[in-house]
Amino acid sequence: MILGLTTILLVCFIPLVFGAVTADSPAAVERERPAPVAKETNADRFRRGLGPLPPTRREHNNLSPRASSVPCTRLSNNVGMLQINRVSDGQKIGYLSARFNRRKAYTVHPRPAAALKVAVPPVTAFGVAINLVAENPPDSTHMFLGAVDDGQGNVGSGEAGVAILSGTSSVHANSPPSSSASTSLTLANHGGVESQIWTMNCQTRQVTAQWINTDNSHPQTTIFYDPAHEYLGLSGDLEAHSAAVSRRAFGVFITFVPE
């Protein structure tokens, strides 16, 4: 009788031991997992008298880079010279000359005393097109430092066409070449004129150009100097231009140097 009772107790006890839920068992984990918290909405916050949720930050890979978070400061002197340096090695080759070449295009002079003096806006916002206005122009009827289509087609990749720097009349920013604007350039069969094509980094004072084609396309624009023909110009493909016209042309960068 005692043996039979012991057997019954063991039979009842074993399932309790081996069937018990341990702390590591899936059932225990599921039971201990906290219930999901409902995402708070602006409506929930408004009902509790709170302000709206902060805006969600999203990462974008196609954001345009900014030049700097440092604000532009007013120039103490907004009249100065334009220094010309070779892109390949940074060597200074001179300054934008106050005299034209034989076709009345702007060229380079090694001495600052012979440099063209230009006025820039006292404050230049990043990326905003500006005019460069000559203070001692070789042609007083064309005081703007502009560019003139050479008549050989668009400026752009694979194109030999360029724009030549010369004195011009004023043309609005973001405009294709104007056939009604005038220029000092005496090159035969040249195309239209642009003047407000420049931007200046207010911290480095580097001056860059953006040419606009007749179809309103905006090609990547390289400033270059051609020592064989003694002129400065704008190209969208300097290799294509050099192969077709002048193998001596090379890229340059321009820096505004206040007086």
Locations of the language-model features?
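Extracellular glycan/ECM-engagement signal in secreted proteins
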Residues: 24-96, 158, 163-259
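N-terminal signal peptide
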Residues: 2, 11-28
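Phenylalanine-focused residue identity feature
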Residues: 13, 18, 46, 100, ...
